[in-house]
């Protein structure tokens, strides 16, 4: 019996966990298995990368963007199809988001659906404001709060709704028969 003890021997030290070293193709394989970014993050990264690009009315390219053209291309980069105008973008998603629940990637609409931006972080949005300006990140001012109409969170559920609508718009119009007497 050990002095002062209850007759128990000290526990043997645990073996350290084995280490694994990856080389060459193994490293590449692990890198390729990374978790993909969520769609909102891909879209937000796209929009933020376009900061400094000029506003061009009707624009949706590297030459320039209007507000809805920027959102269209940002979410297109994330694999989500949006309609062209701000009003159509707002109407394409049934789930509306209120001001207090805004998150990065949400599309925010202002001025009777005449303008759209994307939440970049709490209290800020990235957007293409108007002629003579550039794509930029900007604080959501009190004026914006007062002009706020609503917001949407583009997601796969909304995409299906928009895809159905788009398919209907592309369907051929029924033939109209006319008779002459």
Question: Which residues are covered by each model-predicted region?
Answer:
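Catalytic cysteine-centered active-site loop
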Residues: 50-103
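Aromatic- and glycine-rich peptidoglycan recognition patches
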Residues: 1-20, 28-32, 96-97, 120-181
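N-terminal hydrophobic or amphipathic helices/low-complexity stretches enriched
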Residues: 28-47
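A broad detector of the eukaryotic-type serine/threonine protein kinase catalytic domain
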Residues: 52-56, 110, 156
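...with weaker cross-activation on analogous glycine-rich loops/strands in unrelated enzymes
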Residues: 80-141
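A generic structural-conservation signal
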Residues: 20-26, 57, 84
């Amino acid at each position: 019996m050990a002095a002062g003890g209850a007759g128990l021997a000290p526990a043997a030290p645990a073996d350290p966990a084995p280490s694994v070293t990856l080389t060459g193709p193994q490293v590449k394989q692990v890198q390729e298995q990374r978790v993909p970014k969520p769609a909102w993050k891909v879209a937000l990264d796209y929009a933020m990368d376009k900061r400094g690009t000029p506003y061009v009315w009707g624009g949706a390219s590297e030459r320039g963007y209007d507000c809805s053209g920027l959102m269209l291309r940002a979410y297109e980069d994330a694999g989500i199809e949006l309609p062209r105008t701000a009003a159509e973008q707002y109407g394409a998603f049934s789930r509306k988001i209120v001001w207090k629940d805004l998150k990065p990637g949400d599309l925010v609409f202002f001025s009777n659906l005449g303008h759209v931006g994307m939440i970049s972080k709490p209290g800020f949005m990235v957007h293409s404001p108007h002629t003579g300006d550039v794509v930029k990140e900007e604080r959501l001012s009190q004026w914006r709060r007062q002009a706020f109409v609503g917001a949407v969170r583009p997601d796969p559920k909304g995409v299906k709704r928009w895809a159905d609508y788009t398919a209907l718009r592309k369907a051929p119009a029924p033939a109209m028969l006319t008779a002459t007497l």
